[in-house]
Amino acid sequence: MAERPPLILASRSPYRRALLEQVRLPHEAIPADVDESRHPDEPAHDYVLRLARAKAEAVAERRPDALVIGSDQAAVLGERVLGKPGSEARAREQLATASGQCVTFLTGVAVVHAAGGRRQSDVVPYRVHFRDLDETTIARYVALEQPLDCAGSFKSEGLGAVLFQRMEGSDPNALIGLPLIRLFDFLLACGYPLIGSEE
């Protein structure tokens, strides 16, 4: 079997790293230094796609030999983009807004292999229908889970599932921040063996 090229995750997210570890993809994490500001009136779809590409390209410039994965996510409620709350008060506010509503999570993913001249990217949507949440439930959840670094103010891999009525989408991993099924498509197109000897 041909030796796999290095795989780099252009992120400091422990959630994305954990997903790659679960599927036994040996990788290195190198955070990309890119401006993550959203352009005025930039649609959420375009925003996450642009950032996923920018993160992968930034790291690929330093490591052209590697397959570099970039990813970014936004939560959208109506026309409003919900970012990472950063504080308990903001997390409670976001969850109160999402109560009884459908929030669409858009996750951009990009794979860049500069040496091979390959660039692939896509956006994977995933919809979460929230239960009607009372103030006490929201406060307890935020205090216990501390979802301050998560778009939409919850962790679906933890207690966050108690907040949901139902979920819709092709890849539940997209909700955690890295759509593995689409990523596998990209890696296979680059000739990267997904199941092979671990280093």
UniProtKB/Swiss-Prot annotation:
Q: Is Coiled coil found in the keyword set?
A: no
Q: Source organism's superkingdom?
A: Bacteria
Query: Which UniProt key words apply to this protein?
Result: Cytoplasm, Hydrolase, Nucleotide metabolism
Q: What is its EC number?
A: 3.6.1.-
UniProt subcellular location: Cytoplasm
The cofactors required by this protein are: a divalent metal cation
One Gene Ontology term of the biological-process aspect is: nucleotide metabolic process
The reactions it catalyses are: N(7)-methyl-GTP + H2O = N(7)-methyl-GMP + diphosphate + H(+)
Q: Where is the active site?
A: 72
GO CC annotation terms, alphabetical: cytoplasm
Q: Which Gene3D superfamilies match?
A: 3.90.950.10
Q: Which InterPro entries match?
A: ITPase-like_fam, Maf-like
Residues in coiled coil: none
Q: Name one Pfam family in it.
A: Maf
Site label Important for substrate specificity, positions? 15, 73, 157
Q: Which GO terms describe its molecular function?
A: nucleoside triphosphate diphosphatase activity
Q: Which family does it belong to?
A: Belongs to the Maf family. YceF subfamily.
This molecule's function is given as: Nucleoside triphosphate pyrophosphatase that hydrolyzes 7-methyl-GTP (m(7)GTP). May have a dual role in cell division arrest and in preventing the incorporation of modified nucleotides into cellular nucleic acids.
The name this protein carries in UniProt is: 7-methyl-GTP pyrophosphatase
* Species: Alkalilimnicola ehrlichii (strain ATCC BAA-1101 / DSM 17681 / MLHE-1)
